[in-house]
Swiss-Prot record:
This is Uncharacterized protein YdiZ. GO terms for biological process: DNA damage response. Pfam families: GhoS. One of its GO terms (molecular function) is RNA endonuclease activity.
Length: 96
């Protein structure tokens, strides 16, 4: 994949939440920064990604996204997350 290509990513943030407020804060921080709670496939069907899972359409590298998500998660919850990043195509094919 050439640098600068738009890629659809699915990012899962794994951390131990002590309260529902932490989940809400995580959602707020990431969605305000452009992360999505749903993704649309090539046929136009909308897919909910699930708790602590976010979509992002970006030209950034996986490492840049990991750093961004880590910083936003730490700001939202005060905790260090474990982050999994896959492409939309890989994530969607693993669901079937």
């Amino acid at each position: 994949m050439a640098s600068g290509d738009l890629v659809r990513y699915v990012i899962t943030v794994m951390l131990h939440e002590d309260t529902l407020t932490e989940i809400n804060e995580l959602n707020n921080y990431l969605t305000r920064d452009g992360f999505l709670l749903t993704m649309t496939d090539d046929e136009g069907n909308i897919h909910e990604l699930g708790t602590n899972t976010f979509g992002l359409i970006s030209t950034q590298s996986e490492e840049e996204i990991r750093e961004l998500v880590s910083g936003l998660t730490q700001s939202a919850t005060g905790k260090d997350p474990e982050i999994t990043i896959t492409t939309w195509e890989e994530w969607n094919s693993n669901r079937k």
